[in-house]
Every structure is written in C-alpha cells, then in structure tokens.
C-alpha cells in the first residue's frame, strides 16, 4: 500500500496541499503540490558522482506544461507536446534563480529538477505552485540544500497589495511581482509595473517576503514528518601548505591597481597568464603531484577575493569609475533607412542595435496557453550573437538566456506602450546586441525606447534601464551603478531596474549569496534612480518625444466605426462589394463584429479612398437628398437606379424629365450614371426617385 503523507495549510486566499510518498518514489524526492485545482508534480534527482573538472554547478530545472492539464489536445500534426514554449522556459528560469545560491559552494553533483503541470485552474497560474513544490522537494530530499524558500506573487490594486492574485485580479493590477526568499533574506525578484515609485516597489517586496514565511514554516513541518537525512558532503580542503604557497605566489604577482583602466579582454588575458604561470611553477615545485583543476579553482576564488577587496577598500572599479558613475553613452536614432524605426545605443563596451517594425492585427502573435488563449500585439526579441563578446559560437534558435532577457526588456516597455485604440498597430522590437560587457538587456530597453519614438509609436514616456551590483563582506557593502560583466561575475547581486522619470516599469533582482536585507534593496533603488535620470537626460538630447508621423515604409491603418447592421452592405452579396473595393484601392480591410472597420495600406491616398467609399456605402439615405446612381434595369414604366451598397430605387417614367417620355430607352441607357433625388422610402425600404430638374436630359 502506498504511504502518502499530506500536509495542508492556508496561504492567503488559497489552500496549499503538499502530498509526498506515493508518486515518483525512485526520485530523491517528489511532491505533488496543489493550489485550488492547479496541481504540479515536482521531482528532484541527484547524481552520486561529482563532476570535478566542471567549473560550474550542474543544476538543470525543467518546467513543463501538459495540455491535458487544461483538458486540451496539443497542436501540430503529431498532437504531442514538443520543445518547451517561451512561457515554460521563463518559468524554468524563475524556479532556478532563487534556489541556485542555496546549494553548498563547491557542490558539483548533477541535479535535475522537473516540474510538470498536471492540472490547471485558469485563475491560478502554475508558476508559484511549482516554486513551492520545488522548495518542498529539495527540503525533503537527501540533497544538501540551505532552504526552504518561499515564493509569492504580489499584485497592487486600488493602493492595496494582493497576495497571489487570480488571473482576473492580475489583469486589473498595476503590479505583477514575484518574490522568493528564505526566512531571513530575499533571493530573487521578478516584476513588471505600471510606473510605480521605488517605495511602492520596496513595500511590495517586503509584503511578499513577509507573507511567504507561511510557506517556509509549513515546509519545515512537512520535513519533520517525511524528510530524509541529508547526505554528508563537505568541500574538500586543499592542503594548507599548498594553499599558503599559492596564495603568496599569486599575491606577489597580481597588482590590482595596475588592472584599473585596462580593457576587459586585456585584463582577463593578464590574469589568465598569471594563473597559468603559477600552475606551471607549482607543478615543477610539487613534482606534478597536484590536481590542476583544484589549483585553478583555488586561484579563481583567490582572484575574486582580491578584486572584491580592492573595490571595497578603494572605492575604485576596474575601469576607473567611482561606484555611482555610469559609463560613457553614445546614441544615434534613425540610422537604418528602410526600417520603421531604429536606434544604436552604446554604453561603454555594451552596444545594442534596436529596430521597431509596425504591422497590423494579422501580425499579432496568437498564444494558446494553459490558462487561456490571448493575442499579443507587442513583441520584443533579444539576440545575443557570439561576436558581441569577441567569441565564436553556435548561431541558431534563441537560447534560454536570450528569451529571458527579451522578456525582461519587454516588461520594461509595457507600461508606456499605447493601447489598440490609441495606436492600432502590432509592434515588434528587435534588439541585436552587437557588443557586450554587462547590462545588455538594459541597453536593449534604452534602445527600444529610442527606436519606438523614431518609429512614431506614441509611447507615454522615455524608458531607461540600468544594472546595479553589490559587493558585500559581513556588514560592509558597496552598491555599484551600471556594472560591467567582470563586476557581475565577482559580485553578490544583479539588480536590473528600468523606469521613466516618474517611476519603475520593471525590476529583476538575483542574489548570488544566501540573501540580502531590505536596507540593501532600498539603497540600490535610490542609486538606480539617480543613474536612470542621468541616462534619460542623455537619451532626451537625441529624441525626446515620438515622431509626429510613422515611416513612409510602414502601413497606414485607418479605423472607422459603422452601425453593425450595415456590415452586410460593406461586404455585399457573396463578398462582392468588399472584394471590388479592396481590388480597386489595393487595401486590406478588416471588419469586426462591433462595426469597427480597419483599412490598411502602404499608400495613404488609396486608404483614404477606401474609407470614403465605406462611409458612402454605410451612409443613411435621406429623403430629399440627391445622390449619384447607376441605371441597372430599364422597364416600360421607368428605370431602376442603384445608388450604393446595392440600394435600388425606381425612377418612374414621369420623373425622368419635365417633358413627356414615350420610351425610357430614348433617355436612359444601362450603366449610365445619373443624379437622382429621393422622394419617398416606404416601410419595406423601397425608394421612389426623381431625375426631374437635376439632370440635363
């Protein structure tokens, strides 16, 4: 009989159910976690073998959604789930980031975490459910892990913070923030905001962290009932004499002050040459009786320690900047003649070539997600080719990092984008990172803001982005503005923030140590605000407001509203009217059920002709008014004249002219255009027309 252990607790407006012991028993740990009807199965498996020659922690997180969870079939020919969607990749990264710092330093065993969504309530997004499940599974397992962590989504509606808002609540929220942390520290923040103040953002982080303590406490209770004993793992200590020898040798050869102002490539080359020389000397000294990988790891850690100490002690960074100084910025807008909008944003050795393309509703992305279908009118894609770091690499489909950075840049711009009523275009922004030395995603946000303005997109305000770093030793810490890649590598925090002059639009914070306090976050916000304002000042010197008109190469979209009852008149019998209109004017015409008609053309004059014709077709015929019509039938007692949209009326033989008419054909021919006056419209809509006194016949 399966031994299932179930633990339930209240978390905000929802009940969380943790179930372990009955499913996936071959894994190191497995948890089935449910909130409402959203259920995720989380498994954790660790290898027994250490990858000693690997320079990074081999942790892999797979978040996967099964369509059966929502009672759906997968799309495509094979009717089977394929490669992960963008949403699945982003959630995998969301889970990975807060747990990675909580494994022991030097732990190099393979760990694979799989979170599978097996049931979904469209009102409860599975990401928070999966994060709670991963925290519980790692805590229950025998794998060394300094958790558990909690996770919370925070909304902001009517000046009130909402814990884990539903999908409907989130659509009305000014904030979508996910925060994860331990019982005492914050580890990760991911958010998009509708231009909120730094204090509002900080309060949201504090609120989410306080609320998630319930999760941590209840996971600890479950561990007491069902947790495994952690297996004994300790970092192998290097021989004391060897470590002292290496330390003295390295310190004697490295002068950190001589590295200040040296470019990234030369600095890394100097440091690598020193390390390889030390390894060669050590091999001779110890008769090759040493582990080269162990020595290199020791030297790398020593290098980081020396570089960190230098910044803390001297307040001088690798490139000679003070802690609060941003790099030199160079901006050009409108540099690509045939794109709808473009900008080149360069900050130090980081550069992004950003373009904006305008399209129609037909270009929008239709997303079939577990929580429901939706249409995305704003796309932002981030490309990071290998040449941007002077390397040779694989070129192909976007990797996880590119997808994550693109989504962050998109979050940064969403708050200032116009709605479909203000600007009826689908917009695609592409950032080509042409040089990279830190903060390329933030450069992409700056470039996106500039390119959108160059394209004439009426964004509400300019948006800039900056990455802040942290060096922390015990209670002593320093915040660095606009960090470069080496500072990111040796630092304890990556704090990326974007915003306008009035507030924050996006925040992504990742901590590499076991957490930071609210005070550090508050200082980071204040310094980021100063940096953003300086960057915005420089951007505004190039382009401050959107251009008044869109590119001559962009499609023109004209929108009009008609009575829905007249849609059939615009379409015509079998589509005859709209087909003839589109062919004559070379336009695309989209008609909505509510009577909104969009006319699309690369030629503004042609589009105007189509709009005028639609307005003519849908106009109400007024008694006493004069219209142009075409003779369509001739009979003994008169002629039938079609006005527009197939509206036909009779001109009686007595109403053709003031003279006596014996034969209608003596005065009128089929296809002849004539002016007619509407005399009467009966209840059935039949019109009585007159040509008398109007036409020269």
Swiss-Prot record:
Chain residues that bind Mg(2+): 488, 494
One example GO MF annotation: RNA binding
Top-level taxonomic group: Bacteria
InterPro entries, per the entry: ExoRNase_PH_dom1 (IPR001247), ExoRNase_PH_dom2 (IPR015847), ExoRNase_PH_dom2_sf (IPR036345), KH_dom (IPR004087), KH_dom_type_1 (IPR004088), KH_dom_type_1_sf (IPR036612), NA-bd_OB-fold (IPR012340), PNPase (IPR012162)
Domain KH per the UniProt entry, residue ranges: 555-614
Keywords: Cytoplasm, Magnesium, Metal-binding, Nucleotidyltransferase, RNA-binding, Transferase
EC numbers for this chain: 2.7.7.8
GO biological process: mRNA catabolic process; RNA processing
Subcellular compartments: Cytoplasm
Catalytic activity: RNA(n+1) + phosphate = RNA(n) + a ribonucleoside 5'-diphosphate
Cofactor annotation: Mg(2+)
Domain S1 motif: 624-692
Predominant cellular place of this UniProt entry's protein: cytoplasm
Function: Involved in mRNA degradation. Catalyzes the phosphorolysis of single-stranded polyribonucleotides processively in the 3'- to 5'-direction.
Family to which the UniProt record says this protein belongs: Belongs to the polyribonucleotide nucleotidyltransferase family.
Self-association and partners: Component of the RNA degradosome, which is a multiprotein complex involved in RNA processing and mRNA degradation.
Identification of the protein by name: Polyribonucleotide nucleotidyltransferase
Organism annotation: Blochmanniella floridana
Lineage start: Bacteria, Pseudomonadati, Pseudomonadota, Gammaproteobacteria, Enterobacterales
